[in-house]
């Protein structure tokens, strides 16, 4: 199997890295020359990487084609590429729907929308896919945990929550910077905060079959620090603002 990636940004680079670190079997990975620095770096790291001369070469030579480009670039270039009906085409594009992709691609190829995030480079994290596909599910299970979504409308919910990645990191940055202002060395501050969030996230995953309200409750003691923290953030509208932002992202995606 030959894998082809159109786009070599952060997501594409992360998926490619995860694939190369996995035990997946493939002949080679053909990547876009667009971001020369990332393309050359990937080729230097992994021996099965080939840099294409253009996007059409990627389509011509690949069994599976991954579209990892911005919506604006996607709208501009996809319609001019000549795909084959025998191919499986993956779209990581947030705002282009399956029906729009089918219209632009023109041939009756298998098209799957997927939502990988940067931790896929570590073979960690969920990968929602729509529509369900057994081969695609098996593929992404080598790189994380595949979540199959039958309804594209429902997939918008997952796309919306993927917009919380930068806010998650921003919260850690704010807390790390606060420690630095208090005299803690940056390396120590960032190591502590990121390790804290990792441990809390792992604990949440272990208890993910329970209502997360229980974790919120169990992490507080009467008049304790965590009770103060959650109450003050609630009063400030922090959590309502979080939900409002999710709704705003959802509306943008729900065309």
Question: Which residues make up each language-model segment?
Answer:
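NAD(P)+-binding Rossmann beta1-loop-alpha1 motif at the extreme N-terminus of oxidoreductases
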Residues: 1-53, 57, 177-181
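Solvent-exposed alpha-helices and their adjacent loops that cap or buttress functional pockets
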Residues: 4, 23, 82-83, 104-105, ...
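A general structural signal for well-ordered alpha-helical segments in protein cores
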Residues: 12, 39, 62, 74, ...
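Rossmann-like NAD(P)(H) cofactor-binding subdomain of soluble oxidoreductases
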Residues: 15, 30, 36-38, 45-129, ...
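Small-residue helix-packing motif on alpha-helices
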Residues: 29, 39, 58, 74, ...
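A short acidic, helix-capping loop that chelates divalent metal ions and anchors anionic groups
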Residues: 39-40, 120-124, 156-158, 228
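Internal alpha-helical scaffold of NAD(P)-dependent oxidoreductase catalytic cores
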Residues: 100-110, 125-159, 163-207, 248, ...
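NAD(P)-dependent Rossmann-like dehydrogenase/reductase catalytic/cofactor-binding core
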Residues: 194, 198-255
């Amino acid at each position: 199997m030959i894998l082809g990636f159109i786009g070599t940004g952060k997501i594409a680079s992360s998926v490619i890295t995860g694939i190369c670190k996995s035990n997946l079997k493939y002949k080679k990975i053909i990547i876009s020359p667009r971001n020369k620095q990332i393309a050359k770096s990937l080729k230097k790291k992994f021996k099965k990487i080939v840099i294409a001369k253009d996007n059409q070469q990627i389509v011509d030579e690949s069994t599976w084609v991954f579209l990892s480009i911005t919506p604006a670039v996607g709208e501009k270039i996809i319609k001019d590429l000549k795909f084959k009906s025998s191919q499986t085409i993956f779209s990581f594009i947030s705002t282009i729907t399956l029906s729009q992709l089918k219209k632009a691609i023109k041939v009756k190829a298998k098209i799957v929308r997927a939502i990988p995030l940067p931790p896929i480079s570590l073979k960690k994290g969920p990968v929602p896919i729509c529509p369900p596909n057994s081969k695609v599910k098996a593929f992404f299970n080598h790189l994380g945990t595949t979540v199959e979504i039958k309804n594209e409308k429902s997939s918008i919910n997952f796309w919306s929550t993927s917009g919380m990645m930068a806010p998650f990191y921003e919260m850690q940055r704010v807390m790390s910077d606060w420690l630095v202002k208090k005299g803690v060395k940056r390396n120590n501050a960032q190591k502590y905060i990121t390790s804290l969030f990792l441990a809390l996230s792992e604990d949440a995953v272990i208890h993910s079959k329970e209502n997360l309200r229980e974790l919120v409750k169990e992490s507080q003691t009467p008049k304790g620090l965590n009770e103060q923290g959650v109450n003050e953030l609630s009063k400030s509208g922090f959590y309502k603002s979080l939900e409002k932002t999710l709704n705003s992202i959802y509306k943008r995606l729900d065309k």
